[in-house]
Regions:
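Conserved phosphate-binding elements of NTP-dependent enzyme cores
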Residues: 1-950
Length: 950
């Protein structure tokens, strides 16, 4: 039997000295509660050690260019293969990265266009062909014996002027005749051309009669004409037509030259191909007037101009005062009071000079005569000239990304877009959905020579497109920017890229690849994972999805609890072996001993509804959607069907603009009816709760403020005069100044990875010695930050305010996180649950709309059960909950389902079904209904077995 991967003494993070042997060339799933230690074992131990050993095998010179991972806390690992990690945190933040560049399909497209494209004039649209001298000579001989020709070299094409200097130079060079505007002249004669008219001048190189033995002379004449005409020449048949030839890519009609089609001119990341206006980004930041003045009824004096609060002495308002005076208006007017001409000038700027005085920062007052700049160009200029990050960030809220006005989002120069394959340029190909590209390339009509060149390129493109389809990304376009992809989409793109590499004998480690996938797409993903395994690879998948766990060859269940209560192997083996272990929560859910029950009855709501009319943003097909208030609604549908567009971009942003006077971008919809029935809108997304390690769950929820207040009330703190600020690690006073309250110091190592060592002064405690001398129940402030939520609950049992917040964090499944855990180390799901807990801590007013996008991300079935209790409780209190979700355990307990589809991308964007889960199951063309029906039936069966038929 082949030796597996042997792990001995794994103690990384919360792991409890794990000893484990994993089989090779199998699909292995690590399961367990959130925070049980799955990622610690998979990524922080197995992958880290595999990567470290690989980098260590390289030379010291090579190592300095590679990030090296720290050695995990482990005795040893044997039998490791080269390891590749495909997680969700490695998403590109580069606006130049697209689906096409990440998957390398764009590189193959560039090669295809360089070798098998056809050129068309960007001005007149006529085909452009490049010909060699031999090809031109052969074409002329084919005109037939006794054909009389004039070989002409064009020296001026549609150019104004008398061209006297040009004609004189031609005389000096010994040329005898020219053709000007189709009239033949001798250069010895005086040629008069009108100065203000466009003229075309061609030099007569030779006059030839086609006959046997003429090829040598014809070749010399053609070469001379091409040289004089800069790659262009004309063969004029006497008493017949002109034949235009080009040795370059140049239009014979317009004279427009195109560059040689090489791969670099089709790259928007190369100056030879990138649109010069947007530098290949395809978009530019422009000031948005709707954000600058969201309410056009408010006067300028009361702050109508949001980016620039009213101050009569500033440069803007001195100008504006003079501008309004010209229209006999004052600062007490609003934008809507302006005449139409003034509105245009206010937005874009005027031509009339305004007289106004301005006192600068040195106290000097000067008189100025300037035209009003216009609020839109001024906002853009101030953003570009901002000298602090904070100012730039503030002004960025009033800018939106718009397609480049020159390339219209194509990213490339017009010359690059002149080349076509299958009558489409490379930008048009990139804008097609992956599902449409596959048949396009399969049915591509190429000439025989082009087929030979393109065969291998098309094979690679076909494979990569197929892999994208197999991981459920058929709705994406190659031009989609990588920064706009969700974590799950980005991970599956990297997965598709790895499949394309065809590597064998590799250890792949994946982090919840099923996130964001509809059950139908999940089936394709599982087939892909099995295909990678069958190639001869080992796959370790950290996953909560039941179908993935059931499909595994080997399951390792980590637990039994989270945090300090986890870190042990509760069960390992096949599905049947894990189901037999009573201590395994995963096994019990798989077996059916534990399950999430159906609600006793479905709510019908409070009689009111939110109605979205005419939603047509992105791929939405002008749909009307009703969302019942006072109910738990779930929006379902395949990846790319329009769920996030409908709920996040239209419902949340549109409702927020109505209720809170925010200035989100104007998504395409007609109206939202029923906004008056909602008091508050809360969007609980998966964006980080902070961008720095100083942010944590305790600071975000204000829990830390209460804890600092408690420490300041101790007798020792009172005696020393310490206020709550003394116990903050963000400000001077109580923090350790050696590490500025970080607790660690980074040491840069040239040949090794950067090393983070505990601060020598505070030894990682973050505070100075005097602050740490203050204790509450024997613990100092640093000790408290190192506690998990579960540990802190009994510690603060006598403080209701702190206890209530801690219990809320525990209820949302975050009992395992440390109070001081940096926000930068939290997953999107953890950040979302911190936000949910923060909202739950606030006083409930009822009539609140809660929006959550895939809240089950990273959650075990047991955690989902707890989360659903909280969400149902919110609805019971008179609120409305709208959730975007694929997890069928959540979908089955909804009061209402809005199912979008039927598929993703252009094939989605319609309401497939609406109603209760039972009603959705009856809709035959609903993919959600097809997968939901057996889940509801199984749950009913389990409820009947456990509780009898109610």
């Amino acid at each position: 039997m082949e030796k597996g991967i042997v792990i001995q003494g794994a103690r990384q993070n919360n792991l409890k000295n794990i000893n484990l042997t994993l089989p090779r060339n199998k699909l292995i799933v690590f399961s367990g509660l959130s925070g049980s230690g799955k990622s610690s074992l998979a990524f922080d131990t197995i992958y880290a050690e595999g990567q470290r050993k690989y980098v260590e095998s390289l030379s010291a010179y090579a190592r300095q260019f590679l990030g090296q991972m720290n050695k995990p806390d482990i005795d040893k690992i044997e039998g490791l293969s080269p390891a590749i990690s495909i997680d969700q945190k490695s998403t590109s933040h580069n606006p130049r990265s697209t689906v096409g560049t990440v998957t390398e399909i764009h590189d193959y497209l560039r090669m295809l266009y360089a070798h098998a494209s056809r050129a068309f004039c960007p001005h007149c649209g006529k085909p452009i062909e490049r010909q060699t001298t031999d090809q031109i000579v052969d074409a002329l001989i084919d005109l037939g014996d006794r054909t009389k020709l004039m070989i002409l070299g064009p020296v001026a094409v549609s150019q104004k002027g008398t061209h006297k200097k040009l004609l004189e130079e031609l005389r000096k060079e010994g040329y005898v005749r020219v053709r000007a505007d189709d009239v033949l002249y001798s250069l010895s004669d005086e040629i008069v051309l009108e100065k203000n008219k466009k003229h075309t001048i061609e030099v007569v190189i030779d006059r030839i009669i086609i006959k046997e033995g003429i090829a040598k002379r014809l070749t010399d004449s053609v070469e001379a004409a091409l040289k004089l005409g800069d790659g262009m020449m004309i063969a004029a048949v006497v008493d017949g037509n002109d034949h235009i030839f080009s040795s370059h890519f140049a239009c014979p009609n317009c004279g427009i030259s195109l560059p040689k089609p090489v791969p670099r001119i089709f790259s928007f990341n190369n100056p030879f191909g990138a649109c010069p206006a947007c530098m290949g980004l395809g978009s530019s930041l422009e000031a948005d007037f709707n954000r600058i003045i969201p309410n056009r009824e408010i006067s300028f004096r009361l702050g109508a101009i949001k980016p620039f609060p009213y101050n009569r002495d500033t440069w803007l308002y001195r100008q504006l005062d003079a501008f309004l005076e010209g229209y006999k208006l004052t600062m007490d007017c609003c934008y809507n009071d302006l005449p139409e001409k003034a509105k245009v000038e206010f937005q874009q700027g005027g031509a009339d000079l305004l007289a106004f005085s301005y006192t600068n920062m040195e106290g000097e007052t000067k008189e100025y005569h300037r035209a009003f700049e216009g609020i839109i160009p001024m906002t853009k200029r101030r953003y570009e000239e901002a000298w602090t990050d904070k100012m730039k960030e503030t002004l960025s809220n009033f800018l939106i990304e718009k397609p480049c006005p020159v390339c219209h989002g194509a990213r490339l120069r017009p010359e690059s877009l002149a080349f076509r394959v299958g009558n489409k340029n490379i930008a048009e190909i990139s804008d097609m959905a992956v599902s449409d590209l596959l048949p396009f390339f399969d049915n591509l009509d190429l000439m025989e020579k082009e087929k030979i060149i393109a065969e291998q390129i098309l094979h690679e493109i076909h494979n990569r497109l197929t892999f994208l389809i197999n991981v459920g990304l058929d709705y994406l376009t190659l031009s989609r920017t990588a920064t706009t992809l969700s974590g799950g989409e980005a991970q599956r793109i990297r997965l598709a890229t790895q499949i394309g590499s065809g590597l064998v004998g590799v250890l792949y480690i994946l982090d919840e690849p099923s996130i964001g996938l509809h059950q139908r797409d999940n089936d394709k993903l599982l087939d892909t994972l099995k295909g990678m395994r069958d190639l001869g690879n080992t796959l370790i998948v950290v996953e909560h999805d039941e179908d993935t766990i059931r499909a595994a060859d080997w399951i390792v269940d980590i637990g039994p609890g989270a945090g300090e209560q986890g870190g042990r192997v509760v069960a390992e083996g096949t599905l049947e072996q894990v189901e037999a272990v009573k201590d395994s929560l995963t096994g019990q859910y798989l077996k059916g001993s534990r399950y999430i029950p159906l609600p006793p009855k479905r709510r019908t709501g409070n009689g009111m509804s939110l109605i979205i009319k005419g939603a047509s943003e992105h791929n939405l097909k002008h749909i009307d959607v009703r969302i019942p208030l006072g109910a738990f609604s779930v929006v379902t549908g395949e990846s790319g069907s329009g769920k996030s567009t409908l709920i996040n971009e239209i419902l949340y942003q549109g409702l927020s603009n109505i209720k809170n006077r925010t200035s989100y971008g104007n998504a395409a919809f007609e109206a939202i009816e029923g906004a008056e029935y909602v008091d508050k809108i809360v969007n609980i997304d998966q964006q980080p709760i902070g961008r720095t390690p100083r942010s944590n769950a305790a600071t975000y929820t204000s829990l830390f403020s209460d804890i600092r207040e408690l420490f300041s009330q101790t007798s020792e703190a009172k005696m020393r005069g310490y206020k709550p600020g003394r116990f903050s690690f963000n400000v001077k006073g109580g923090r350790c100044e050696a590490c500025h309250g970080d607790g660690i110091i980074k040491i840069e190592m040239q040949f090794l990875s950067d090393v983070y060592v505990p601060c020598e002064v505070c030894h990682g405690a973050r505070y100075n010695r005097e602050t740490l001398e203050v204790r509450y129940k024997g613990k100092n402030i640093s000790d408290v930050l190192n506690m998990t939520v579960d540990e802190a609950i009994p510690f603060f049992e006598n403080h209701d305010k702190i206890l209530r917040k801690l219990r809320t964090l525990q209820e949302v499944g975050l009992g395992y996180i440390h109070l001081g855990q940096p926000a930068t180390t939290m997953s999107g799901g953890e950040a979302q649950r911190v936000k949910l807990a923060t909202e739950l801590m606030r006083r409930d007013t009822g009539d609140t709309l809660y929006i959550l996008d895939e809240p089950t991300t990273g959650l075990h079935s047991e955690d989902i059960r707890k989360l659903l209790v909280i969400l149902q409780k919110l609805v019971d209190q008179g609120n409305t909950v709208v959730v975007i979700e694929h997890n069928l355990d959540v979908v089955k307990v909804a009061d209402y389902i809005i199912d979008l589809g039927p598929e993703g991308g252009d094939k989605g964007g319609e309401v497939v079904a609406f109603g209760t889960p039972e009603e959705i199951c009856k809709v035959k063309h609903s993919y959600t209904g097809q997968y939901l029906k057996p889940v509801i039936e199984r749950t009913r069966k389990l409820m009947k077995e456990h509780h009898g038929n109610n």
